[in-house]
Amino acid sequence: MSSSFKRKIASVNVRVASPEVIRNWSNGEVKKAETINYRTFKPERDGLFCERIFGPVKDYECACGKYSGKKYEGTVCEKCGVKVESKDARRRRFGHIELAAPVTHVWYLKNSPSVIATLLDMTVKDIETIVYFGSRRVNERVVIVTDPKNTPFIKGSILNQTEYEIYAQKWDFEVSPAYIVKEPRSPLVSDIDGEVHIKHEKTHTDRELYWIVVKNISRTELKVYTGMVLNFKDNDQVNQGDEIVSEKRVEAIFAPFDGTVEVDEISETITINPLPTSKNNPITFSLPYGVRALVKNNEKVKKGQQLTTETILNSIVAPVSGTIRYSKQLNLRPLENGLYEVLTNGVIYIENVQNIKQYPVFEGAPIQVEDGQMVKAGDILADRFLFEEEKLTIEEYKLFSEYYPGMFVVEEQIENDKPIMVITDIDPSVSEETGIKKGQVITQQDYEAYSRIYPGKIEAETGAMAIKKLLEKIDLEVMKAEIEAELKKIPKSSVRAKKLLKKMKIVKDLIDSQTKPEWMVLEALPVVPPEIRPMIQIDGGRFATTDLNDLYRRVIMRNNRLKKLLEMNAPEVIVRNEKRMLQEAVDNLIFNGKIGKAYVDRNGRQLKSLTDLIRGKKGRFRRNLLGKRVDYSGRAVIVVGPHLKIHECGLPKKMALELFEPFVIAELSKEENTEAPQTKVKKYRKELQREDPKAWEKLEKVIQGRVVLLNRAPTLHRMSIQAFEPKLIEGNAIQLHPLVCPPFNADFDGDQMAVHLPLSPAAQAEARLLMLSRYNIISPAHGKPISMPGKDIVAGVYYLTMVDKNYDKIEPENIKWKFANPEEAELAYEFGFIKLHEPIIIKINDKAIKTTFGRVIFNSILPEELRDYNKTFGKNGIKDVVYKTFKTHGIDRTADLLDSIKDLGFHYATISGLTISLKDFMISPKKNEIITNAMKKIEYIEKLYDDGLLSDEEKYKETIKIWTETTNLVQEETYRYLGENPFNPVYIMVDSGARGNKDQLKQLSGMRGLMADPSGRTIEIPIISNFREGLSVLEFFISTHGARKGSADTALRTSSAGYLTRRLVDVVQSVVVTEPDCGTHEGVRATLLKSSDNFVVEKIEDFIFGRVLAKDIYEPGTGNILVNPNTNKSYTRDTVILDEDAKFLSNYKKRVNVVEESILDLSVGNIPEVYAELAEDIDTPSGLIPSETEIDWDVVRKLRDAGIKNVKIKLYPIVGSVISEEIVWDKDRKKQIAVEEEQVDVALAKLLEENNIDSVYVRPEIYVRSVLTCESEHGVCAKCYGLDLSNHKVVTVGESVGIIAAQSIGEPGTQLTMRTFHTGGIATTADITQGLPRVEELFEARKKTKDPEGIFSKVKGTVVDISNDEPKKIYIQDELGGIHEYEVPSRVRVNVTVGQKVLPGQSLTSGSLKVRKILEELGPEETATYLLKEIKRVYVQQGVDIHDKHFELIIRQMLNKAEVIDSGDTEFLPGDLVPISLLNKVNREIMEGNAKVEMNRKKIIGRELAKHIIVKNEDGEIVELAAEGEEVTEELLEKLIEYGIKEVVIMNHDKEKEVYQILPKETVKYRRRLLRITQASLEYEGWLSAASFQQTQQVLTDAAIKGAVDYLKGLKENVIVGQLIPAGTGFDIFSSVQYEETPRLAKEEKEKFA
């Protein structure tokens, strides 16, 4: 059985899919929104789960069941159309939805910056409005056509101002500005009583206008009688006294024939009825006024008989002047003379108008009165006189405002929501005439206006179709040429240039990836395979479905409805609404809630769209691709296994049987080879379930030589997964070796651990050789042991090696027991003659040693040279001895030692009977005395305060100071008092380091001390009691704040630390050791890291340990290479610095003379090893060589040529070393000349000489290799990284040092406090943000820090003055005498004094420095040092030790990029962030290319162009300089050079394309940038890794536009695609290794660890 590692996927490419590609992916169109039939539970045909499209639901069976079985594979059923294949097809087969209208892709529209908007030069808001068929709110004037002339308008047509302006450009017509009526009062009521008259006319805009006239009239009534003749007509004017009716005589009536009369008194008529024999008809006479009938009713009369009396009608004279009005009931007969005769009695009137009112009413308003109707004041005349929003011309407005003042208001502008459209095509002549361009957004009304003026010459659309048409019309090559031409004319820093560069980037990306812009608008929508969006039947016959199905259903339903509407030719407004809803549905399917309102389910939960499925913690990337589930794994509670060896674990039998099942079955099946394999497996599986004894036997056999992996979550570093040899045990819990608890951070209070079984021989080999717990004793974070004894083992060893308090006082001659060897002592102990802690004399290696038997026992397990018979071993002692064993004897001996310590520790912890009671917490009698003294001091401070000698702040600080000192005194005294009895159990625990510390002891037996309030400020009142005595109520209350804050912090800390680790891992995940040596001569200077408040962050010893020298180390004073006298090791370049070297170099210092005078013999061919210069001027034939000229070979040559034999010189042996004293003062002791860790240059040496300083202590200058200066193109090299701290050997190629660094920094993250300490001024620092927030602040290079900003020195110099006026200022004089002024911000304190020497980057005040400013002023080296110092400081303060190289790796990634300022002639764009190494490489290539220009010009003459060349000429036109396939001639070449074409693509003889440079190119100019870790992760070149980190949608959008290819260089990318990571054994150089599994006896395996 063999296996080898080969990576199969070389790269992953992501692009924008064209509609054709989407259709090609698809196996059929999804036409219905149905999913599963509720009766048959089978997928609906053409639905979202259709078997015809996505494949069969049952393995190898079609939908109708006609074809079933693997033999029919590939057959398409003619009945149901389903292809017979595996049901796995439902995981990979796509469908698609053919959209009835195009739809924009939300990622390309709502990205930042929006790709579509950038390409079209439109705003995202406009595009969104167009895509969503929206409108634009417009405020504008309105006009009314008053004279249309020869236009299609009619009088009264209403136009908006913009419409009018458009029409007015071409047509001649007259308009009047319109006023828009608002709030007209209604109804219209009469102001007076009177009679109504209605008139009607037309306005000048041909609109109807009604006049309601109400007249208030006084009337004189005159009666008129039948027969009277009226002298005046209706409406005639009369004057008082005029005769209206003249006097008239009325004759009597005589009967015309014989007959009978009927007299009707009511109607005042007489009717004569003729006799029956007569032929006459009846005649009726009206009786005039004043005439009487002379006959009775029914009386017979003769012809000629008088029937009535005669009378005279008097005249009627007008009593008043006025207008004659006839009553409506008056019955008149016109006479020939034009007058009227009254036929019936009635009345006429003389009217006088008292009042008249006119009411104009506009057309359409309902009138409520009739002509002639009488009305009262307040009666309604009409519903209204004007309608709301009625538009009036100026004349109309004036008319109405005259008649209705204050009864309505008008606005001159109208506010409207107008649908907007975008111009998709326009005739160039029209464009020039109107100034409208393609892509301009206009309102629908404006578009209609343009269409009427320029029919067929302008096109506008709305919706996604408009965007699609615009994108289709983009010629990317032309656009690129236009942008390039414009960029040449404008300054690169202008806003326009930045905008153009963004656009240029997108255009270039689209060209390079061969993507058509219109593909960003979807025509077909892919439907993901149904198994990725399943439906599951739940109880009650209902179905639970994935949100995606709901979103797809909504799209399909809307799409189908739109298709129907289009077929029916539905009105545009309905179609538009449906298109908008379709766009919304697709948007929400892709990214729910990005535009508009998110879709939610019935519980109000937002539905998960495609974007949500891939982004975030629960998304596809992080949950499924980076976090995979593991087969062959189990999980159980852990218990301690004290009997185990360090590389063993106890595995419960049942669990092992389950894990190793296939192996056990394989072993069982080897015995018999009869039945078919399938049935055999079933049979053996049953045996296993029955727990057959044979199975246990085989399990024992199978388990031999195999290791399992144990993992405890959270997996914070690589030690959280280790390999162990399993030992089968009874029970259900995994047994864990106690010493591996620290790396796992495990305890036995219910923790659970997971077991994983590596299957292949390769995996087993890797687990055994690299992951076995015995090889993981040393931590890769700091190189010290991590698998360490703790708790009872430490207590046991301490108890074993401790002594009585009088031990030191007993003289050897007074000791009773003396032994010749340890065996004798053991015998005496066994027989009870001596006790463990009794002093004895014992002979060891021929030496008599005073010790105790306990110490003899413990030393017997140690390597001989590490034994110490006079030492009590606590936690640190054990750690030291373990570390020394590892250094001298290697990892295997260390593992054995740890096991021995464990056994001894447990044994003697048991024997000690360690237990504690309340009495063991003893309180020192001196405690009260100390507190009383403190109280007195406090009283004094109070008195000073009361006298006004101290301010509030000063009093507070002094109080805090006193109580802090007191608390420390009480702590020390309590510990001393407890230690008087070394066997006190509490003391044993604390002193040994097994449990607890002095601080806890102080609280239990001393005093609790000062507490902080909720804001973090220290409370002045201390807690004087301890827990043994009990707290008072006030004390208890004070202490609650801290306790509560502690709990809150812990909760916050965990998540913050986890997130920090995640970002750190992401930023360095691809950093792997890629080569043994990058060959760089750069390095970093080893220095003592001190913070601004003189807190030593790191000693030189720790700084250089585990590194490789970058330069030789020279001995100060002699210039020879430094040699370690203890080991005879020379410190030349490439030497690895181990522990002992680091100690030697850090402690090495030497007093060296500042200056020495000497004579240089020029006849000997040497120049001094140290810096030297001429002591006097020397005249030579070639000229004067002045004194103080440095002596080098040039000077020596000149002097020899002048025949000079020897010269007087000054040697400065101190130059090139580093000051090792604290401070060197000038002769007046006012000014510091040199400070510790300052490099000595010539200027400083001379300054020391001037101040008569003869000699100083210096140390050699040490430069070590660092990842910060590594020049490997990918990853880092082994020499720059140095030692692999987990084994103290130079790191191997392939080690994933990035992830180790991130884990080393992230793992202790939870130990860092969240708290911002407010120390109340005890500490020398101001209130500095500490803990996790500070680390994050630095890694994220925050622009705003929580602390006030401090200032730093930009030069090397001396503080000459500090002015205290506001604002304070610090003045620094540099070495050349220049003065630099620094203004001190208000919230910080000055940290320097006058006369103090400062170095560049040194903090002058309290507060934190802005890292970006350091980078700008002092460059990347100082920035890296500051970051390292500040980040490391937080960890050191919390007692966490992490090697610098881990921080440096992160800082390297933060400083790895530079921002392009001027791209020169490269593909980069200004603002691009590019790795420094790449920029340097590109610039190098440009310089090399520039050298070949002349040669290339000659080469291309006579060759064919492989690509056409287009440029923009001086007139702004795009022209083609040369066509594809054209031959390059001298003339063409000159033309190309004239137009500044720098590169041409030529066809070579093999018809392949080659690029030739024909003009020199400009290099890239850039500036170093500091990236915060989040940004550094996102700027990572591989898109897969960046997408899986954060802002997934943004990263994928950008990558798709670019057509980005991920070459899978990092670790994450390879995990995502499911192949071996390019690190460790997966690194390329190991890829061909073959692993063979040879049958080996378990015995041999055991012997190795025996």
Swiss-Prot record:
Binding site for Zn(2+) 1: 62, 64, 77, 80
Cofactor: Mg(2+); Zn(2+)
Binding site for Zn(2+) 2: 1078, 1270, 1277, 1280
Class of enzymatic activity (EC top level): transferase
CDD domains xref list: RNAP_beta'_C, RNAP_beta'_N
Binding-site residues for Mg(2+), renumbered to this chain: 747, 749, 751
Subunit structure as annotated in this protein's UniProt entry: The RNAP catalytic core consists of 2 alpha, 1 beta, 1 beta' and 1 omega subunit. When a sigma factor is associated with the core the holoenzyme is formed, which can initiate transcription.
Protein name: DNA-directed RNA polymerase subunit beta'
Record organism: Fervidobacterium nodosum (strain ATCC 35602 / DSM 5306 / Rt17-B1)
The gene coding this protein: rpoC
